Amino acid sequence: MRLLYFAWLRAKIGTAEEELALPSQVDDVNGLLNWLKSRGPGYAEALKDLKTVRVAVNQDYVGPEHKIRDSDEVAIFPPVTGG
């Protein structure tokens, strides 16, 4: 899976993108975010309040129950606001 991180999430996690193999128990966005939190303090800090992040899978906004696969591209970013 290709993961992309944007804005302050990128700064806290320490990378803009990475390729990872999903553990077999991770099959949806919620499971992915919770698994990522266990990968280290930067991930835990960036993802501590899941209400402050949005997720797109293959460039489509999705909710926490959306199913994911190893071949997906997942972008994690803060909510977008206009002005």
Language-model regions, residue ranges each:
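Ubiquitin-like/PB1-type beta-grasp interaction modules and other compact soluble beta-rich domains
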Residues: 1-82
